[in-house]
């Protein structure tokens, strides 16, 4: 049986994109580590973020759909990777815009994440 190398390449690329996103999320959360109480745990591509008020946000991958899902206290979002960004399939907003606003609301803090402002090298 011939191996489908195109599928493998797409799958590997998806995991690289997800890994990159999760690392950027961690970098941004760690920036606030000594300023506010934010805990996060990553297990099997599911990141659970818990704020001091016990409010939770979950970020996870949906491999079969090639999507990132974001679950907040108020809504759920599905993101597809388009033109170097994770874009919400309903609102067409960037992941970082929604994630930053959701974290700010749920933590009762004005959080500003820099990952979406970084220039790609």
Swiss-Prot record:
PROSITE patterns: FRATAXIN_1 (PS01344), FRATAXIN_2 (PS50810). Coiled coil: none annotated. Gene3D superfamilies: Frataxin/CyaY (3.30.920.10). GO terms for cellular component: cytosol. InterPro entries: CyaY, Frataxin/CyaY, Frataxin/CyaY_sf, Frataxin_CS. GO terms for molecular function: ferric iron binding; ferrous iron binding. SUPFAM superfamilies: Frataxin/Nqo15-like. Keywords: Iron, Metal-binding. Pfam families: Frataxin_Cyay (PF01491). The keyword Iron applies. GO terms for biological process: iron-sulfur cluster assembly. It comes from the Bacteria. Involved in iron-sulfur (Fe-S) cluster assembly. May act as a regulator of Fe-S biogenesis. Belongs to the frataxin family. This is Iron-sulfur cluster assembly protein CyaY. It comes from Buchnera aphidicola subsp. Schizaphis graminum (strain Sg).
């Amino acid at each position: 049986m011939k191996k489908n190398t195109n599928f493998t390449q797409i799958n590997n690329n998806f995991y690289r994109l997800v890994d990159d996103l999760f690392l950027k999320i961690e970098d941004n959360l760690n920036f606030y580590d000594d300023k506010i109480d934010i805990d996060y745990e990553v297990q099997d591509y599911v990141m659970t973020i818990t704020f001091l008020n016990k409010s939770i946000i979950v970020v996870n991958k949906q491999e079969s759909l090639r999507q990132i899902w974001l679950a907040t206290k108020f809504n759920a979002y599905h993101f597809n990777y388009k033109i170097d960004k994770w874009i919400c399939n309903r609102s067409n907003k960037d992941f970082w815009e929604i994630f930053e606003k959701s974290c700010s609301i749920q933590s009762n803090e004005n959080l500003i994440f820099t990952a979406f402002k970084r220039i790609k090298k």
